[in-house]
Amino acid sequence: MKKIVWILLLGTLVWTAFAQKAPKWMDKEKKAVVTVTTYKADGTTLHNGIGFFVDEEGTMLSAYSVFKDAQKAIVTDGNGVTYPVERVLGADELYDVIKLKVRAPKKVSYLEIASQPLSTGQPAYLLPFVKGKEKVASFGNGKVEEVTKLKDSYHYYKLSFPLQVDWLNAPVFNEAGEVFGLAQDDASGKKEASYAVSAAYANSLSVSSADAFNTIYTSIGIKKA
């Protein structure tokens, strides 16, 4: 009997360890995740957050709330190298997303955006910022609990896992390692679950001539596209 209990316990421990092991692709994709620091006009820090690159030229997605009222911003990669945020390419205050151009001296690592939306029950993984040579030790792992329409062909997702403090705006991936969303808190204040706004939607944003006097953009002192 004791032997059976021991075998069952050992099996449980092995399963738990396996379930908590980060997918192999995370070690590669972590290079595209950066920290963001925005500054006021007097040079003092306004906000800190997370962003991630979606092409090798330095296009980055992040949260609009991190940039609102900012006069300057920089990003820092896992190796401690900093780059200036050059331009705002598009923004949506309602859904708290922003698209930016970062000035980098060379091509950067970036995340592939999922071409297809996820459906209820599919696995979802969140990758926080991880420093250079560190392994991914903490990450979000769960399922898509609910899918709602955002705009046009874009979606908003409810996820089965709660967010840690430093996970806000981190990229959320499908099982293949393609990013499909930016992590967001539950607006109701509950901590049992989290949400993800479509990364494809954020990447579709652009600035038009009609936005010249739009407060969404005039509240940010960084150059617009």
Residue ranges and their predicted role:
Residues 17-46, 221-225:
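Protease-domain processing segments flanking chymotrypsin-fold serine proteases, especially trypsin-like
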Residues 20-23, 38-57, 63, 81-84, ...:
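A conserved glycine-rich beta-strand in the N-terminal activation segment of trypsin-fold
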Residues 36, 71-79, 124-129, 146:
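Short conserved beta-strand and strand-loop elements enriched in small hydrophobics
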Residues 48, 55-107, 119-120, 188:
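Catalytic-histidine neighborhood of serine endopeptidases
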